[in-house]
Curated annotation (Swiss-Prot):
Gene giving rise to this polypeptide: Dimt1
SMART domains per UniProt: rADc
Source organism per UniProt: Mus musculus (Mouse)
Enzymatic class: transferase
Main subcellular location: nucleus
Pfam family, one: RrnaAD
NCBIfam families recorded: ksgA (TIGR00755)
Transmembrane spans: none
InterPro entries registered for this protein in UniProt: KsgA/Erm (IPR001737), rRNA_Ade_Mease_Trfase_CS (IPR020596), rRNA_Ade_methylase_Trfase_N (IPR020598), rRNA_adenine_dimethylase (IPR011530), SAM-dependent_MTases_sf (IPR029063)
PANTHER family found in the cross-reference section: DIMETHYLADENOSINE TRANSFERASE, DIMETHYLADENOSINE TRANSFERASE-RELATED
Name by which UniProt lists this protein: Dimethyladenosine transferase
Amino acid sequence: MPKAKSAASSRRRDRQEQRRELKRAGGLMFNTGIGQHILKNPLIVNSIIDKAALRPTDVVLEVGPGTGNMTVKLLEKAKKVVACELDPRLVAELHKRVQGTPLASKLQVLVGDVLKSDLPFFDACVANLPYQISSPFVFKLLLHRPFFRCAILMFQREFALRLVAKPGDKLYCRLSINTQLLARVDHLMKVGKNNFRPPPKVESSVVRIEPKNPPPPINFQEWDGLVRITFVRKNKTLSAAFKSSAVQQLLEKNYRIHCSVQNTVIPEDFSIADKIQQILTSTGFSDKRARSMDIDDFIRLLHGFNAEGIHFS
């Protein structure tokens, strides 16, 4: 009986909290289908803002402001907040929340899909992202110019752990190495699902991303083309990964284009398979596996291919 009473009490508290959040949001029902999970715990909101180390002169990009729980606190710290929100109902709530206050003049709201929007200039980014746009948003952010100082981002826990994974880790993947090529990434804290309204089905984590400025002198499309091939089967040796007929056809096409531009004659008995194996052997990566290779390894491998006229984009 005590357990039943406890469960009933917990459900009652959840309903009461939901009613309070609905009241704060003007009676809005949140659309979880587009990732609307409002961060309700003020301690976590404050911690995220502290981690951003904002300056009074900063312009802050906030993605997914929701009902403005974090927006208001950002406005108190920064010179300006540019909030990107997809839902017009929440845009109205944001404006209503600061209407008639000194903070109103510091808020700019961009209405629409952040992935399809041109990002403004900003010094720092703070975002409680819809989790389904995590990967494309990270790379939109990292390829944005001019450089920003840092981003404090909320992600699904597993995605966050992939971002910070190192060679040899189970979760180490293409996302890990591509992100770490362009930025320093740190896991800051775990956030339980009950800190959101409505609660998501997964646990969350907060990550800090600082872009490398200047960026590494590497063509990212070339880099990603190589990494994509090797991580399709990250446990295979590179020798095996490059035996794929689709991969060889792509690289031979690129090689022939390169030779045509350079006015280089290709021997009649040319074999792309032999060429690839020769490069893998000479660079010492033939028996290596992507799961255990770090950024320096991939840079050496990419330079080895490019030096022989083989390109990945």
